[in-house]
Every structure is written in C-alpha cells, then in structure tokens.
Amino acid sequence: MKVLLIGGGAREHAIAMALKKNELVELYTLMKNKNPGIYALSEEVSFNSETDVPAIKEFAEKIKPEIAVIGPESPLGVGAADLLEEMGIPTVGPKKLPAQIETSKEFMRNLFKKYEIDGSLKYAAFNEYGNEIESFIDEMTSLGKDVVVKPAGLTGGKGVKVVGEQLKDNDEAKIYAKEVFDKSIGGGKIIIEEKLVGVEFTLHGFVDGENITFMPAVQDHPHAYNNDEGPITGGMGSYSCPNHGLPFISEDMLDRAEKIMEKTVNSINLEVGPYKGFLYGQFMLTADGPKIIEYNARFGDPEAMNLLPILKTDFLDVCFAIAEGKLDKMNIEFENKATVCKYVVPNGYPIDPVKNKELAVAEKAIEDAGAILFYASINEENGKLYITGSRSAAVVGISENIEEAEKIAQKAIENFKGEVYYRSDIGTLDLIKKRIERVKKLAK
C-alpha cells in the first residue's frame, strides 16, 4: 500500500509513525530537509519544497500512490490537494478553497459572520494602513477592549501580536499594524480583532466532506518561556487528559465548541465546497463560553504528537474514510491515556534563532525514559543533526495520568545537547491549577 506523505516536521513524523503501524504501508515522502525520523520510515524520499507543485506532481507520477496525506498548511495553500485529486489520488487534506479557513483569516471571519456561527468576535480587515485602522482601534479603546493584530496570511504562527503580551497598548498595536504593511508580513493584509480573555484549548476533528469525528481536547502552550511568558511561538508543548477533556472545561462547554466546528464544516461546504482532511480549532474559553481564535486546515503541531500515538483505530483506515467520505461508517477510538509533549527549540527562537548548529540527541536514553521522540526542523548531514532555526525536536510521555506522563516527558527532554532550550512547566500540576483558577475567576 503506497502512501505519499508531504511534509517534514514533527507533525509529519507523528503522521508517518501512525501510518507505519499498519504493516502494509509503504511510505513515500516529499520534504525539504532530511528529517531523520521520517527518512528512516520511508521507502523513498523526494527532497523538495512542500510548495513545489511540479515536484509534487513528478514524484506522485513516479510512485503512483494509492492515497496521499498532506501535513503542513503551505502545500494546501498552493493547491497540492487539488493537483493530487485531479491525478485521481485520494487525498487527505482540503483543496485550496476550503483550506482558506486557515490560509485567509479574513475568509474565516467573514464565514462566521455570513453563516451566523457562534463563537465569533468583533473584527475588521484592512488592505492598507490609514485612518480606517486608527479609527477602528480607537473605537475598540473607547469600548474598553484591547486588540489583536493578525497578518491575514500564513506566518507560521508567529505573526500575531496581542496587546498586553507582545504589545504594550492599543497605540503600540497601530505601530505594529503599520509594520505589517511596510514589511508585507503575511501577505501585507491584516485583521484586527478584539482581544479575548480566558484560557486557550484546541479541538481537532477528522472531516470527510460532510461528517466530523472529534478527537480528545488538547491544551497547547504558545509562549516561549515558563509561566506563559515571552513571545508567541508555533507551540512549545501540549498535554491531553485520560478522559479526553481538560481539567478546566466542562462537558457543556466542550459540546458548544464541537457544535461551532460542525457548523463551520457545513458553512465551508456551502461556501466553497467539501472540506476533507484534519481540522483544528483553536478556542478561547471566555466568560461567554468558547470563542474561536483561529482554525488550522491540518493537524496542530505539537497536538498531533499528543493525539496520534493514542489513536487505537488504524490510521490508514481513518485516512481512507476521510478521502472517501465514509467517516460515518467508522467507530474511531482513542486510548484513555494522558499525554505530555515538550519541544526543544533553538536558542533565540522565535525572534532570532541560532541556525545550523549541531544537536546531540541521546535517542536510547529518551527511549529508556519511556518517551516517544519526534524530529522537527532538523537536517541530517553525514550522520550529524543540525538545527535549522525553527523548533528542533519533541518528546512525548504517555501514562495513566498527567503527573506520570509529565515526568516521562521531562526526563526525556533532558537528553538533548546543543544550543537549545525548552519549557519545563508544560503538563505540571502547578501550571494546570493556574488554568483552573483562571477559569474560576472568569465565572465570577
């Protein structure tokens, strides 16, 4: 069974591992750098940019896969799924138009407005800097609301800036908004939204064009440093719980979040056609219930590393059900286990990361700790590993409870030597208690 995988990060390493649990799978991967974890699982690798559509076509024509799985967002944005579907290859990953739920923040917000989907917020989109932006921000200030400045296109999770975190106040938000246009960050178009106050969580679904099957809820940690301090990153780690919920969210609130995602899928279908693939909703649990921060048209990274290792159902079967519109005929199960994922990242990440420095990884010690190792933005050359400037590698601890899973992950994360750092507090009971207390305060 030939499977084409596009992408070379830790998320794709998790996808590759999950696929290879089926002994029939022969994996063929197109990726930019030599990720040693994915390379070891692949029959053949094409080293090309994941947005190089002619290279994707050439590789697919050569290997003739029976199904394709697209990992990152960038190939979705250039129509990789459209190409593969046109070639007659069942594909897991939305086509270019449905993928706008991630690639165009304006499309996402307009969809919520048009179809009156719950969980929306006050926002405005702008094509240039001028009086309109300043007036909108001034209006938000008069309402007592801080703002979030979001480049409208893809920025790898690092273009968003929030007042009270990366920005001092709404006046500084104006300065950053001008910078987005001056530097054409994320395509040189922006969304300015009201800042949501609450606790973040993520919810994933398998989507087959009509049906959505939900996965366990996960909490990501986007801030670079312990205690949720520092700049926003692509995600420093995450955890999930044995009951598939989270300690600070009720079943009712989780159900409301699921209904928001269900209506989103239906609205995408009505607006631009069927959505097939993985859908990731990033939510803020506020005093008014769950609100959507943004959607991703693929697995979250790091969340894929929490979810896929505890998937009991054959992942290849799930992929075919997505591609063929048959999710309603499947009973998809996850183990009732806790997971904790922690990332090592280059010193200086995400602002000014060191690059092309050697990273020593004690793989045996990580295995002995009981953790799973996932390679991310790593390049292997002549038997040595080099960091490339983005997140380097992740470890995942899995156990009956969060406390034990965190201990496994922490023991494992100490087995990297190089110019890297990590957050030691992810999955700890102290940090989780802070989340619970924050939600209690919201309810008052």
Curated annotation (Swiss-Prot):
Its EC number is 6.3.4.13. It is an enzyme of class 6 (ligase). Mg(2+) 2 binds at residues 294, 296. It comes from the Archaea. The keyword Electron transport does not apply. Binds 2 magnesium or manganese ions per subunit. Pathway: Purine metabolism; IMP biosynthesis via de novo pathway; N(1)-(5-phospho-D-ribosyl)glycinamide from 5-phospho-alpha-D-ribose 1-diphosphate: step 2/2. One of its GO terms (molecular function) is metal ion binding. One of its GO terms (biological process) is purine nucleobase biosynthetic process. Keywords: ATP-binding, Ligase, Magnesium, Manganese, Metal-binding, Nucleotide-binding, Purine biosynthesis. Residues 109-324 form the ATP-grasp domain. Mg(2+) 1 binds at residues 282, 294. Mn(2+) 2 binds at residues 294, 296. It catalyses: 5-phospho-beta-D-ribosylamine + glycine + ATP = N(1)-(5-phospho-beta-D-ribosyl)glycinamide + ADP + phosphate + H(+). Pfam families: GARS_A, GARS_C, GARS_N. Its cofactor is Mg(2+); Mn(2+). Mn(2+) 1 binds at residues 282, 294. ATP binds at residues 140-202. PANTHER family: PHOSPHORIBOSYLAMINE--GLYCINE LIGASE, PHOSPHORIBOSYLAMINE--GLYCINE LIGASE, CHLOROPLASTIC. This is Phosphoribosylamine--glycine ligase. It comes from Methanococcus maripaludis (strain C7 / ATCC BAA-1331).
